[in-house]
From Swiss-Prot:
Residues annotated as binding ATP: 30-37
Function: The RecF protein is involved in DNA metabolism; it is required for DNA replication and normal SOS inducibility. RecF binds preferentially to single-stranded, linear DNA. It also seems to bind ATP.
Major localization listed first in the record, in broad terms: cytoplasm
Source species of the chain: Glaesserella parasuis serovar 5 (strain SH0165) (Haemophilus parasuis)
Protein name (Swiss-Prot/TrEMBL): DNA replication and repair protein RecF
Length: 361
């Protein structure tokens, strides 16, 4: 699976872009502010219906324009699929897959599985648990066909319970929600635990490859004490939850924590080491997806050389080539891409970008 064509209109400073893409490596070279990151952001938006940089769509639509439009052609073996997304300043979104509307963001996400490595992506390690839950849930969305339904049911029940907490005086009034909530909490948490066990081998292999000098360990916390019954905890914590206005334990508090030589990675690793660990995790998840689903995973890598020396850049390049995936890479100069461009030239295309305009190199 690869993105064979990409059309972008009025997305940030990208007024009109129409690219034929390489199924292997696509390099984008240009100065800061030229539109390199915006191009990766547009690809991400096409596959997720949201940005990895801003939650406010009006900031993404080009100045003095009313909407942005994204279109892509996906090639998978002998089949081709077209996807399109349009967003206006009123927040309305139109999705089309093969010309058919009334599609969901989940349909796009299924068609375009992708991993993103950006300077801001260190939040996977030094940010809040929400980023690590998203990491696990991405994997489960693509791995487990029932997970998306179970996860949405859990979110809906949590929202209803939190709203009911404000109006409820006695726990018996809340119990019907808790019976259902407990069921889906157990399902989601068990799914996450199984996924963690399955992907750990891939994580350990990549950590050894990128950070052999460190012992990296990972621990999954489900959001409440493992030996406790979740339904009992909900009942016992009713007064506390009612006083704060939300449910304080459960899968919405889950975390996937990492330690280096026994200490939290965010406390002891340098930014360069954190980036290498982030790369190890993203590659591990992509490689596990490829192995399980027999499909490619797109990798988006912004500012390839930042925080990494030449040797580490070459290590990252090696793993990306070995994955057999479609890769989009940005850099400020051609020099920064030498460690990755020097590996193979027969499966790569380079573009120069300036003021939102692309030029084939």
């Amino acid at each position: 699976m690869s993105l064979s064509r990409l059309i972008i209109n009025n997305f940030r400073n990208l007024t009109a872009v129409d690219l034929e893409l390489n199924h292997g490596f696509n390099f984008f070279i240009g100065a800061n502010g030229s539109g390199k990151t915006s191009l990766l952001e547009a690809i991400f938006y096409l596959g997720h219906g949201k940005s990895f940089k801003s939650h406010i769509s009006n900031r993404i639509i080009k100045y003095n324009q009313e909407e942005f439009t994204l279109f892509g052609k996906i090639q998978e073996e002998k089949h081709e699929c077209s996807v399109g997304l349009q967003k206006n300043r009123q927040g309305e979104t139109i999705l089309r897959i093969n010309g058919e509307s009334n599609k969901k963001i989940a349909d796009l996400a299924y068609l375009l599985p992708m991993q993103v490595i950006t300077p801001e992506g260190l939040t996977l390690l030094n940010g809040g648990p929400i980023y690590r839950r998203a990491f696990l849930d991405w994997g489960l969305f693509h791995q487990n066909t029932d997970f998306y339904h179970n996860w949405n049911s859990l979110k809906r029940l949590l929202k209803q319970r939190n709203a009911a907490l404000v109006q409820t005086r006695h726990y018996n009034e809340l119990k019907p929600w808790d019976v259902e909530l407990s069921k889906f909490a157990q399902i989601v948490s068990q799914s996450r635990a199984v996924y963690v066990e399955s992907i750990l081998t891939y994580i350990e292999k990549n950590c050894q490859f990128f950070l052999p000098e460190l012992e990296i360990t990972a621990t999954f916390y489900q959001g409440w004490e493992k030996e406790r019954d979740y339904a009992d905890l909900l009942a016992q914590g009713f007064e506390r939850d009612r006083s704060v206005g939300y449910t304080m334990v459960g899968p919405q508090k889950a975390d996937f924590r990492f330690r280096a030589n026994g200490l939290p990675v965010e406390d002891v690793l340098s930014r360069g080491q954190l980036k290498l660990l982030m790369c190890a995790l993203r590659l591990a998840q992509g490689e596990y997806f490829i192995a399980q689903k027999n499909r490619q995973c797109i990798f988006l890598i912004d500012d390839f050389a930042s925080e990494l020396d030449t040797q580490k850049c070459e290590l990252l390049a090696d793993r990306l080539y070995q994955s057999g995936s479609q890769v989009f890479v940005t850099a400020i100069t051609q020099e920064q891409l030498k460690p990755i461009q020097g590996k193979r030239q027969d499966n790569a295309t380079s573009f120069f970008i300036k003021d939102g305009k692309m030029q084939f190199m």
